[in-house]
């Protein structure tokens, strides 16, 4: 702090500002530095909290879907986010080979969340993209069809999809 004061006083003197005026400028700058930085950040943070709370209250499904699509965030796990959404009345549907896309989406007019392929551990966005792309040509009619049309899909990927329940609706296969 002493060195910063000396630099500030020296800079002021180079501009013709000396004595009590230079001291007063330094004192005010230091006071603002101790207050202004945290104050501005707390205002920004308060605004984000307010906006987030408003969205979560009025659009809980959209709020949760957006947080799921922003993973990894480092604050809450996807499981925690889904559990909280359900506790607030949001219906959350699992991954479905026939309808899911890469990320979480809204269904039924925005009141329901459909989990995306990125919620399947170990699947990866490239493989998820391939699944969606192949499904646009035609629906998968079996696991063999999925394996044939999506190069690079492994037994581990199939097991992860099965564990997530992705084959239940589309192929009639349960976990």
Whereabouts are the PLM-identified features?
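Noncatalytic, beta-rich nucleic-acid-contacting surfaces in large DNA/RNA-processing enzymes
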Residues: 3-6, 10-175
């Amino acid at each position: 702090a002493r060195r910063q004061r000396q630099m500030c006083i020296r800079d002021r003197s180079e501009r013709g500002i000396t004595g009590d005026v230079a001291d007063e400028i330094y004192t005010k700058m230091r006071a603002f530095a101790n207050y202004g930085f945290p104050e501005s950040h707390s205002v920004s943070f308060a605004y984000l909290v307010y906006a987030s709370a408003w969205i979560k209250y009025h659009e809980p499904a959209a709020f949760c879907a957006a947080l799921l699509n922003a993973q990894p965030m480092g604050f809450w796990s996807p499981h925690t986010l889904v559990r909280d959404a359900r506790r607030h009345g949001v219906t959350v549907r699992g991954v479905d080979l026939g309808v899911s896309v890469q990320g979480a989406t809204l269904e039924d007019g925005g009141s329901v969340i459909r989990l995306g392929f990125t919620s399947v551990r170990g699947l990866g966005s490239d493989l998820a993209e391939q699944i969606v792309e192949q499904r646009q040509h035609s629906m998968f009619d079996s696991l063999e069809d999925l394996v044939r049309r999506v190069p690079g899909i492994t037994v581990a990927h199939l097991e992860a999809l099965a564990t997530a329940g992705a084959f239940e609706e589309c192929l009639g296969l349960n976990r």
